[in-house]
A protein has these predicted regions:
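Short regulatory helix/loop adjacent to the ATP-binding pocket of P-loop NTPases
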Residues: 93-103
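Non-catalytic all-alpha helical scaffold/repeat segments
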Residues: 2-14, 19-56, 60, 71-76, ...
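Conserved two-lobed SF2 helicase motor
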Residues: 63-66
């Protein structure tokens, strides 16, 4: 309505529109003039790319609307401002006057709804949101198959690309945090952070600027977009300098763990906080994942750099020797460590669980219900959920979760190993890309190695249709493992086939305990008549095989109550 008001008032002052890029602002104008109420002005709009044309047309007529998107045309417009209606568009950070309309990056919900209307799936949207930072200018590049559009204009300037290298590797940081400032200076090889800040200010003035600044925070709009754009400007020294710094930042202990759990929420008041900011830790972790996933393609041929190998080294150095404190200190980072080095991460967890004094099991203690309490096992469970999407790591994750599920955790948190495991193997909404055959083999493995847990998993899948509740598990942020998977199955035949597999497993055990028989009785209502008869046959065979009277009494009471 700002534009409609502009035309109705006949104001001689230009309408100033700013956006991430001039192209985005021009696209916005195109959509605006397609609105029925403004169609009358559309045929009078002229977009000027070059100079010397505007004065010639203005001498003949003033019945047109000028759209200026370069400084040269804007200067040429100045003498004609009182005679012509004009719209000036410019990059948001380079605006020299107050903007009338500012096109900010979309919020999460509008962004997702817009992509849904384009037919994009939930996974497509998650990938594009992460890759674009919800910037429509970057999104256009991510969706384009044209190389000229897929590469940002600033990447053609080798000086700008070189200036971007340390910023892309860091990702996000706090400009008021002294430790962050020092680290960025080391990464950029400058004597003072102020020199780097000046570079950032210059980058902010660019059309389609690759960086952002909000309060004390600085960052790169799209790390993936930028790292591909600067690949030719990254040296081997840059990469190994980053790896050294990553070990320093991510290896920092969390002093808050020195406090009692009830007081950790106020760690800042006690001076128990890390030197490096949380946003920098996350940015460094994400870069580690990107180098692991894309490093060989980006830098392998001309630099001989193997990002996957280097990421695995870093993860091992950060976590070994494994302790409960290290796991808690890296709680939020564990999913990214697992994504960066899946095999190395699983090796570390498996070796620990095979030891007599497992440090991982220390995370499974009950969590208190006091205000601001946090769950120390969440990071580990998300890491394992992320690795369960890949069929290659799926069996190992199921085995690990089976072992963790043997530990009874008496608290009211939903984040428990068994919940993650049940969700991964859920017959109607499996949270893995592993096919049905692999999932059935995994359940059989659980019944063999962790029989109590395997039995519970089978029973969990035998639920009333009306009471079924599913949840989405954690997915990798940068790997495409699980891409296109995780939604409820739409074919009843597939669901029914998986259910039959679970039912067959519970009805064909070699031996049954009284507790198992009671479980079968409680599930009679979800079984077809033939399967119900099989349950009664199992109970009868168990009874005549010499079951103790007290066990028979227990099962009889369950039958009396449930049937």
């Amino acid at each position: 309505w700002e534009i409609k008001s502009f035309f109705e008032k006949c104001d001689s002052k230009p309408l100033v529109i700013t956006a991430d890029s001039m192209e985005e602002a021009l696209a916005f104008l195109k959509q605006v003039f397609d609105i029925p109420e403004l169609e009358q002005y559309r045929d009078r709009v002229l977009v000027f790319d070059k100079t010397e044309i505007l004065p010639k047309i203005a001498q003949e007529t003033t019945d047109f609307i000028v759209v200026a998107h370069t400084r040269e045309v804007e200067r040429e417009l100045a003498p004609y401002c009182t005679m012509l209606r004009s719209i000036v568009v410019s990059p948001r950070n380079a605006a020299r006057v107050k903007s009338d309309i500012v096109l900010e990056p979309l919020g999460t919900e509008p962004f997702r709804k817009a992509l849904e209307s384009m037919g994009k799936s939930r996974d497509d949207i998650a990938v594009l949101e992460k890759a674009s930072g919800r910037s429509l200018t970057v999104l256009r590049r991510q969706l384009s198959n044209v190389p000229a559009i897929g590469t940002p204009e600033w990447a053609d300037d080798s000086r700008i690309a070189s200036d971007m290298v340390p910023l892309v590797l860091a990702g996000t940081w706090d400009a008021q945090n002294e430790a962050d400032r020092t680290l960025l200076s080391l990464l950029a090889e400058v004597s003072s952070y102020e020199l780097l800040e000046k570079r950032i200010l210059n980058l902010l003035q660019l059309n389609d600027s690759p960086v952002w600044s909000l309060g004390n925070l600085r960052g790169v709009i799209s790390k993936k977009d930028a790292i591909f754009a600067i690949k030719g400007s990254v040296s081997k020294a840059d990469l190994y300098r980053f790896l050294e710094i990553a070990q320093i930042v991510l290896g920092e202990d969390d002093p808050a763990l020195d406090l009692p759990e009830k007081e950790r929420w106020a760690a800042g008041l006690y001076g128990k906080k890390r030197e490096f900011s949380g946003v920098l830790r996350e940015g460094i972790s994400e870069t580690l994942v990107l180098l692991a996933v894309h490093g060989k393609d980006l830098f392998g041929k001309h630099l001989g750099f193997d990002g996957e190998l280097e990421a695995a080294k870093i993860v091992r150095e950060l976590l070994m020797p494994l302790t409960t404190r290290k796991l808690e200190a890296n709680n939020r980072d564990l999913p990214l460590y697992a994504e960066a080095a899946p095999r190395a991460f699983l090796n570390i967890i498996e070796q620990d669980l095979q030891s007599d004094n497992s440090e991982v099991l220390g995370l499974l203690r009950p969590v208190g219900t006091w205000i601001f309490s946090t769950c120390p096992r969440t990071g580990l469970l998300w890491a394992l959920e992320a690795l369960a999407w890949n069929p290659h790591t799926f069996p190992r994750v199921v085995n690990i979760l089976g072992r963790l599920s043997e530990v009874e955790i008496n608290d009211n948190w939903v984040n428990k190993p068994f919940e993650s495991l049940s969700s991964i193997l859920r017959v109607w909404m499996p949270q893995t890309a592993a096919d049905q055959e692999m999932r059935v083999r995994a359940v059989k493995m659980l019944l063999d190695k962790h029989p109590v847990v395997g039995w519970r998993v089978c029973l969990k899948q035998m639920e009333d249709y009306g009471t079924r509740i599913g949840r989405y598990n954690y997915k990798p942020k940068w790997r495409r493992d699980g891409y296109g998977y995780g939604e409820p199955l739409m074919t009843f035949e597939k669901i029914h086939a998986s259910e039959r597999e679970m039912i067959e497993l519970v009805l064909t055990r070699q031996t049954y305990t009284p507790e198992m028989l009671c479980d079968l009785v409680s599930k009679l209502h979800v079984l077809v008549l033939n399967d119900q008869e099989r349950v009664w046959k199992i109970i009868e065979d168990w009874r005549i095989s010499g079951a103790p009277d007290e066990d028979i009494a227990k099962v009889r009471e369950k039958i009396r109550v449930a049937v």
